[in-house]
């Protein structure tokens, strides 16, 4: 029978053919793509021969501009030009407000939701902006390699948390890229230098990019990396050097610190140019508007020394955490364009007592290492004749719970093969069957997800609500085929299904579902909370009504019954509305006014059970 292929759309079903895969360094300041060709990993250039793609996106009414042209227009069109979007990945609006003065954008969105940047094309999320950068890199790679890509290894800072990593994966999906793996930037750098081919040793990776700093201490044993310690700062990088120089210009020129976005962009560009010039020169003439001044390398060193000291402090802490001495570090790899600054290299050499490795362009080293890893994961390198392949689930898999809610069992981008189980229970007393509704999607409500299959588990022993334990297991095999089983743990009865709808998902459908999950995330969260409160209220109302029918006249006086009925009526009325908080509070009030009734029922049940029995019988 034809079974549903839960796999990335567009991939070849023939895994043993030569596959085109790339490594991508999605950086704060610059991005680039690399690939292994003729056995060598090298960055891929655009039509003009440029390898580096500035991580800048400018939105026009009818088109999107990415790269150098967008970066150059930043000061003239600051509201529609997005720089350093990596700093916003996976963060809420309240988080990015802490960077307020450094980000001359107009943000829209709720405090706890994804920040959207208001542009002439409408609101753009950081995921969408990053996707526009990745799309250009994908197109560049396909043009250079002469075919479609089967996947990419994308690097991220070791410090990125789960939400930032997920945002990176989502951006790749929107750009039409299959993510083979997210690789920590320090590990990619070590691979680029071939340090994974050494027999053993301790290696430090000092990664100072445009917006983040990472330090990783790795131990290599028998060609296998063991991460001994990591550290760093998600808000420390070359951008901060630029801001320090910009502050110096403002102070020296006697300018107002309250600059409009265009002037702020222009100031930062002047600061960045000065920093880059001082890599080779001892001094540089700086111009901003009508002001002109001279910045020396010594003055620059003084400005950035506090930031360098922060990075060295993190290095010492990371080494201390490993329990080894600084002298035991055998190699120090420099990563990130900001490590070109002479004082940075000097400080690192002084700390570790050895010259760092700088032979590979620090802007390219991460992408080069990622490309080597991508070539392996795509199956182009053989180890003992076996292909190393990796695939992931493109959209989350789950099932429907009470209230029409989607409960995710296997999150999207989980590597397959995989099996995950979760326990559920019955909703009503005496329930002997359970309907299992299998879903696919990222939204909170069943109505917004894709229905895959339905089946029933029958023969559940009748018992009070919540007593039965039903374990539902989702299993996706190496070919992406999904099977779902449900088992009542007490009796052992089981039912299962293999999902077999008549069609799969296209790329456009996956993209639409992902974009909808971003766009409606806030509304979905509110709707889910409301449904959860309504389900809790309904469960309590049914329990109280059942208790009243059974024991109300016997254990309650007329006034007590009246109070309980009034509270129940008020809760039923609130459940018709959309105020989740009010429903929650009224549910608590109803629970409180029925506490005494519940205690009396318990006492009555215990007395009835003990009636006519002596102590010896009870002890037996």
Swiss-Prot record:
InterPro entries documented for this protein: ATPase_NBD, Heat_shock_70_CS, HscA_NBD, HSP70_C_sf, HSP70_peptide-bd_sf, Hsp_70_fam, ISC_FeS_clus_asmbl_HscA
Biological source species: Pseudomonas syringae pv. tomato (strain ATCC BAA-871 / DC3000)
GO biological process: iron-sulfur cluster assembly
Keyword Nucleotide-binding: yes
Keywords: ATP-binding, Chaperone, Nucleotide-binding
Protein name: Chaperone protein HscA homolog
Described function: Chaperone involved in the maturation of iron-sulfur cluster-containing proteins. Has a low intrinsic ATPase activity which is markedly stimulated by HscB.
UniProt family annotation: Belongs to the heat shock protein 70 family.
Keyword match Transmembrane helix: no
NCBIfam families assigned: HscA, PRK05183.1
GO molecular function: ATP binding; ATP hydrolysis activity; ATP-dependent protein folding chaperone; unfolded protein binding
Record-linked Gene3D superfamilies: 1.20.1270.10, 3.30.420.40, Actin, Chain A, domain 4 (3.90.640.10), Substrate Binding Domain Of DNAk, Chain A, domain 1 (2.60.34.10)
């Amino acid at each position: 029978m034809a079974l549903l292929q839960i796999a990335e759309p567009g991939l070849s079903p023939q895994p043993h053919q030569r596959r085109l895969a790339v490594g991508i360094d999605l950086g704060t300041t610059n991005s680039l793509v690399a690939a292994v060709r003729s056995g060598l990993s090298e960055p891929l250039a655009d039509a003009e021969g440029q390898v580096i793609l500035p991580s800048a996106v400018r939105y026009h009414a009818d088109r999107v501009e990415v790269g150098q042209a967008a970066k150059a227009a930043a000061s003239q069109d600051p509201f529609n030009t997005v720089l350093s979007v990596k700093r916003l990945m996976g963060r809420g609006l309240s988080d990015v407000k802490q960077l307020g003065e450094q980000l001359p954008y107009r943000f829209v969105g709720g405090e706890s939701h994804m920040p959207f940047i208001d542009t002439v094309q409408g609101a753009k999320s950081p995921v969408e902006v990053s996707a526009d950068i990745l799309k250009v890199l994908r197109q560049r790679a396909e043009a250079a390699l002469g075919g479609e890509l089967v996947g990419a290894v994308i690097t991220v800072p070791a410090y990125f948390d789960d939400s930032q990593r997920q945002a990176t994966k989502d951006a790749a999906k929107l750009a039409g890229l299959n993510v083979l793996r997210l690789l920590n930037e320090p590990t990619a750098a070590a691979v680029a230098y071939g340090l994974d081919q050494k027999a053993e040793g301790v290696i430090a990776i000092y990664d100072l990019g445009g917006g983040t700093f990472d330090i990783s201490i790795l131990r290599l044993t028998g060609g296998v990396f063991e991460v001994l310690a990591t550290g760093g700062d998600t808000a420390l990088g070359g951008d901060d050097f630029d801001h320090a120089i910009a502050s110096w210009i403002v102070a020296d020129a006697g300018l107002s610190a309250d600059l409009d976005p265009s002037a702020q962009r222009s100031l930062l560009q002047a600061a960045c140019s000065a920093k880059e010039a001082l890599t080779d020169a001892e001094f540089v003439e700086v111009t901003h508007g009508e002001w002109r001044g001279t910045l020396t390398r010594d003055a620059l060193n003084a400005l950035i020394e506090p930031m360098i000291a922060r990075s060295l402090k993190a290095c010492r802490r990371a080494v201390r955490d490993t329990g080894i001495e600084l002298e035991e570090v055998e190699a120090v790899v420099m990563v990130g364009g900001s490590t070109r600054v002479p004082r940075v290299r000097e400080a690192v050499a002084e700390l570790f007592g050895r010259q760092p490795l700088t032979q590979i362009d620090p802007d390219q080293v991460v992408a080069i290492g990622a490309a080597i890893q991508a070539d392996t994961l795509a199956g182009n390198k053989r180890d003992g004749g076996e292909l190393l392949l990796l695939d992931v689930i493109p959209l989350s898999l789950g099932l429907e719970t009470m209230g029409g809610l989607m409960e995710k069992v296997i999150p999207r981008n989980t590597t397959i093969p995989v099996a995950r189980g979760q326990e559920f229970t019955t909703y009503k007393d005496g329930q002997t069957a359970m309907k299992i509704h299998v879903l696919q999607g990222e939204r909170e409500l069943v109505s917004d997800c894709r229905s895959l299959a339905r089946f029933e588990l029958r023969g559940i022993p009748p018992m009070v609500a919540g007593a039965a334990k039903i374990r539902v297991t989702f299993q996706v095999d190496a070919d992406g085929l999904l099977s779902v089983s449900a088992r009542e743990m007490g009796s052992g009865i089981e039912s299962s299904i293999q999902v077999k709808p008549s069609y799969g998902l296209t790329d456009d459908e996956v993209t639409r579902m992902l974009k909808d999950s971003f766009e409606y995330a806030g509304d979905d969260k509110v709707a889910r909370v409301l449904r959860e409160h309504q389900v809790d209220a309904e469960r309590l109302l049914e329990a109280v009504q059942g208790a009243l029918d059974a024991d109300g006249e016997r254990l309650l006086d007329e006034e007590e019954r009246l109070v309980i009925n009034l509270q129940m009526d008020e809760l039923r009325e609130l459940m018709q509305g959309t105020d989740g908080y009010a429903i929650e509070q009224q549910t608590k009030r109803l629970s409180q006014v029925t506490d005494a009734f519940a205690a009396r029922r318990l006492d009555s049940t215990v007395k009835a059970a003990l009636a006519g029995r002596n102590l010896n019988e009870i002890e037996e």
